Structures are given as C-alpha cells and as structure tokens.
Amino acid sequence: MGKEKIHISIVVIGHVDSGKSTTTGHLIYKLGGIDKRVIERFEKEAAEMNKRSFKYAWVLDKLKAERERGITIDIALWKFETTKYYCTVIDAPGHRDFIKNMITGTSQADCAVLIIDSTTGGFEAGISKDGQTREHALLAFTLGVKQMICCCNKMDATTPKYSKARYDEIVKEVSSYLKKVGYNPDKIPFVPISGFEGDNMIERSTNLDWYKGPTLLEALDQINEPKRPSDKPLRLPLQDVYKIGGIGTVPVGRVETGVIKPGMVVTFGPTGLTTEVKSVEMHHEALQEALPGDNVGFNVKNVAVKDLKRGYVASNSKDDPAKGAASFTAQVIIMNHPGQIGNGYAPVLDCHTSHIAVKFAEILTKIDRRSGKELEKEPKFLKNGDAGMVKMIPTKPMVVETFAEYPPLGRFAVRDMRQTVAVGVVKNVDKKDPTGAKVTKAAQKKGK
C-alpha cells in the first residue's frame, strides 16, 4: 500500500442550476467508492425509466434520496481519490441547511470548488445580485476556506460550443468578483469543463485544446496540503453522551484540535467538570491517541450522563482548558434577514455542536465586509448585506473560542425563523472561571 494518502475535504458551491450534482456525481462515479453493483442497479433503473440523461446527477440524486429517507448510505460514497488525496465532498449545497452545515459542519473544507454555468443566461443568473454564486463564495472566504478551484461548466452548451471567447469573458468577470470577496484570482485555476460530457474532468479534452491549464482532477491534486492542528490544545465538542452497560459514561464527538488519549485528565467547558479519560475508541477499536478529524467515543470515570451535554467541549485540564464565555465580540455578516437587527436581538447561535440563544448586546461598529475597515460607530441597526462587530452575551453557559486560535469553535451561524440569517467569526472572548466545578476522584489522584 505504501504511505496512506492524505484526507482532504472539498465543498462544491455555485448557483442552483450550475451543474454541481452532475459534476460531483461524475467525479464520484469515475474515481470514487460507489460499488459497481449499485451503479449497475442505478443504470438498469435509469434505462427502465427512460432516463437517457442518466449520466451522473442521477447517481447523486439516488444517493441523496436514500440518505434523506434515512437509509444510511455509506458516507464513503461521497468520497473519491486523486493521485495524492482522498477527497470527501462535504454536504453538497442546494440543501436548505447547507449554510448551517458548512459552518457548524463536521469538518472545515480545505478547498472550495466553485461551479459556474457558462451558458448564455445561465452565467448571468448565477452571478447576478441575488444569485447564490456570490453568497457561497463570500461564505467560503469568511469561514476560512482559502483555496478555490473554479470550474466553467457546460462548455458543451456554449454558443458556439466550447467557446474560448465565452470562457475568457467568464474568467474576467468571476476574477473581479472573487477579488472583491477577498480571494486572489491569480492563485485560482479556472478549468473549462463539461460535467455532463466529461470534458477536462479527468482526461484532457480535445474539444478544449486552446486551454493549457490543469484538468479538474489535476487541479484537485495541486491543492496545498492542509496543516492539521494536532499541536494545539485539545478541543473536542460533544455531539452525544451515552451510557453503556458495563462501561459507563461515553461522550462522543470529533477532535477539532489537539489530541486525546487514555490517562489524560480532561476538563469539560463550560462547567469545568474534570475527570480522567479511561479509554478512547474509534469504529469499535481502542486508540492510543485520537487526532484532529477523528470521530471518537471516550470513556470517563465517575461522571453521570446527566452531567454532560451536547455542546460541551472536552479539553486538556493542563493545557488552556475550555471555559464558558461571559460575553464575546464577533464579526457578523447579515445574509438573510427581512428587517433590521438592533441591540437586544436574541436569535439562536449554532457554533460547533452547541445550539444556544444569544443576545446581540451591543452593535459596536458597522464595517466594510471585504476590507474590515470601520464605516460607522455604534450604528442603530444592521440589515441585509451589512457586516458589523457585535458584542454578544449567551443566555446559557456556552463555549466559544476566537476564530484565530480555534477556527472550528470560532465560527457560527445565526438562526432565526428557521433559517440562517447571518454568519460570524469570533474575534475575542471574555471567559469566566467556573465556580464549584466537580473534580472527580480519578482526576484528583492523577493530579497528585
């Protein structure tokens, strides 16, 4: 086997009809882990239903449908391999909760693949003021997805077909837009493709012989290797807590930063409960240590299930332990709110695995969302499209960290009226020391 490939996550973004599913489906179909039998079954069904256009989106639609019906589709189906990487596709957008998932999502994307519809009218709709292309790109940048690949899709349907002039026009316009968002377009490959016909997806296309850059597959291989934050202090937000007969209390979650290992004394923020880790498991195998990205269960001593909740954060008691936030200041971008947001607004914040109402105590400044420059001090309100620095106060104890120190615990979605109305990143936190926190006997013994 040789050295195992590096795992990376990509998020596929773009306007609703840009061909995201077809393109993603194509990659997964050609390079991925979809079982041949499953493909054959789909192809047979497609033929019976006269779905001549079977191609690739259909694979994805089937997978989505099965996933939404609660048939657990092996998540491996959303993976594919390049020469260098194992790629996982994070919840392809179009999904209503996409924005929320992208923020609180199980993993930070290492690269965004922006799909553009190159056809006449299609491109214009996607990039227009209210098109999703802009919003998705802004979101990706704000949330720290610094690498991007741009695919000019549907080149088989431009006028004339595979038109270089059309490609050049799109590259020019999208570049100027991405520059405004904060990306450096010179570092972004613009790959002309057809997700449907397969041009330049994996093999170089003779239809596009005027193009000399990388294919989509080559561009994915050229992504800079992500640095994993295993050298930072431990942060492990809890997703669930189980009581397992004969073992005891087992919190479950994903290591975001640092490492967790048996024998470590952990402190759970925001309560300060401190205890010893007896064992760490992943996929029913005991681990000597778990690293960032690992989804693990770990057994803790002398702790009742009721003392731990989803949204609590496990940390190393001897290395910057997690604490609750008395208040914090965040840069917030309002994306989807019908009215005005003023002081006293109290929506729900989704940050890592916690879901807690937070009060906008004070809107400190309105800022230019691209440059970060201050536009106005203490504005009366913020509305759609505005960005501001806001002082927030959680209504219940919760752990947040600055985006600079612990990115996955420093980005959040603001939810109201069952939708994401804003996104934000935490700039600084006023932490409070827990009072009367329980330290178990096991932890006390360890501490001696």
Swiss-Prot record:
Stretches the record annotates as G1: 14-21
Keyword Translocase: no
Chain spans, region G5: 194-196
Keyword Protein biosynthesis: yes
Matching PROSITE patterns: G_TR_1 (PS00301), G_TR_2 (PS51722)
SUPFAM superfamilies per the UniProt record, alphabetical: EF-Tu/eEF-1alpha/eIF2-gamma C-terminal domain (SSF50465), P-loop containing nucleoside triphosphate hydrolases (SSF52540), Translation proteins (SSF50447)
Domain tr-type G: 5-230
GO biological process, one term: translational elongation
Domain of life, per lineage: Eukaryota
Chain positions recorded as GTP binding sites: 14-21, 91-95, 153-156
Record PTM 5-glutamyl glycerylphosphorylethanolamine, positions in chain: 289, 362
Gene3D superfamilies according to UniProt: P-loop containing nucleotide triphosphate hydrolases, Translation factors
N6,N6-dimethyllysine PTM sites in chain numbering: 55
Family in the record: Belongs to the TRAFAC class translation factor GTPase superfamily. Classic translation factor GTPase family. EF-Tu/EF-1A subfamily.
Protein's UniProt name: Elongation factor 1-alpha
Organism: Solanum lycopersicum (Tomato)
Classification of source organism: Eukaryota, Viridiplantae, Streptophyta, Embryophyta, Tracheophyta
